[in-house]
Design a protein with these regions (language model features):
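Short glycine/proline-centered loop/turn elements that form peptide/ligand docking sites
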Residues: 159-163, 261-262
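Glycine-rich helix-loop "coupling/hinge" segments at transmembrane-helix boundaries
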Residues: 36-39, 205-232, 266-267
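The alpha-helix within a helix-turn-helix
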Residues: 167
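Short, Lys/Arg-rich, polar N-terminal cytosolic tail immediately upstream
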Residues: 1-6
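Membrane-water interface segments at the C-terminal ends of transmembrane alpha-helices
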Residues: 7-38, 54-131, 136-157, 185, ...
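Glycine/proline-centered hinge or cleavage motifs at structural transition points of membrane proteins
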Residues: 170-171, 184
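Short cytosolic juxtamembrane segments of multi-pass membrane proteins
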Residues: 90, 256-267
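A short amphipathic helical element positioned immediately N-terminal to and/or at the very start
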Residues: 42-51
Length: 267
């Protein structure tokens, strides 16, 4: 038995090698480039240049706003859809078809489905040239909505339905039960979906390029431009700023995710 455990321990070696080579080392390189100048010496020039540039601060602010707006829209649309899916009886083919319809676009290339969405909006009279922000937001919601529905659906399946019934037995109406019992119980799914949408939205550049016809510049577009121009230090610092923002967001939501039942209740 001891010999078997000894062998199993080494099965994780390829995993740790992969993490070191493709996660840790690239992250360390980004930090190094972000905190150094073109001569390779440690410097805060990138810090000063970024935070003294009003255009870049504006791009970061717009990216955060669009990320938050897209996250809110995805949750507002995805929550009732997830509720509808969980209320269907087991073995119902309709629920399987609906889940398949939400998952199928994820099987298609990201750029191709974004371009198809752009062409559909053209046909409806909404083009990125005249309505860049509207077209971009539609593209964002379309691409990231499944990432909200799936964790919400999973959380609602695990939710203790007896607590909902207890809320009604204690005299709560549907609105009170929804906001004071169901929402707290599904908060881990809401947070998971929000993080899965907010993080890629902030760093996205393909959707804004394709849907907005390059009339919208987000912080992801700035990072892409810097790396295309071989400006590794400036691009790495902006990427590091985004990593810090995302890390702060994850820390703020950590307690909510680890205590799903502690916040539920009628009062």
């Amino acid at each position: 038995m001891l010999k078997l455990r000894f062998k199993r321990k080494y099965l994780s070696i390829p995993y740790f090698i992969f993490l070191i080579c493709f996660v840790l080392l690239p992250l360390l390189l980004i930090i190094y480039y972000a905190l150094s100048n073109e001569n390779g010496t440690i410097s805060l020039d990138n810090f000063v240049e970024f935070f003294s540039n009003k255009n870049k601060i504006g791009l970061l602010s717009v990216s955060i706003i669009i990320g938050a707006l897209n996250t809110a829209l995805c949750i507002l649309i995805g929550y009732p859809v997830a509720m509808l899916l969980t209320k269907n009886k087991k073995g119902n083919n309709k629920i399987s078809i609906m889940i398949l319809l939400f998952i199928m676009p994820m099987w298609i290339n990201f750029v191709l489905r974004t371009a198809a969405t752009r062409d559909l909006l053209y046909w409806l009279g909404i083009n990125g040239g005249n309505y860049p922000y509207l077209a971009t937001m539609i593209g964002m919601v379309y691409n990231y909505l499944p990432f909200t529905i799936l964790p919400l659906y999973s959380q609602m399946l695990k939710m203790d339905k007896s607590l909902i019934e207890a809320s009604y037995d204690l005299g709560a109406n549907k609105v009170q039960t929804f906001f004071k019992t169901q929402i707290p119980l599904t908060m881990p799914g809401i947070i998971s979906g929000a993080m899965m949408v907010f993080m890629p939205t902030m760093s996205s550049f393909v959707i804004s390029d394709v849907m907005g016809e390059r009339k919208i510049q987000l912080i992801g577009n700035t990072i892409q431009f810097n790396f295309d121009q071989m400006r590794w230090h400036e691009g790495s610092f902006i990427a590091l700023v985004m990593l810090i923002i995302i890390g702060i967001s994850m820390l703020l939501t950590r307690n909510v995710k680890t205590e799903p039942n502690a916040r539920g209740g009628l009062w």
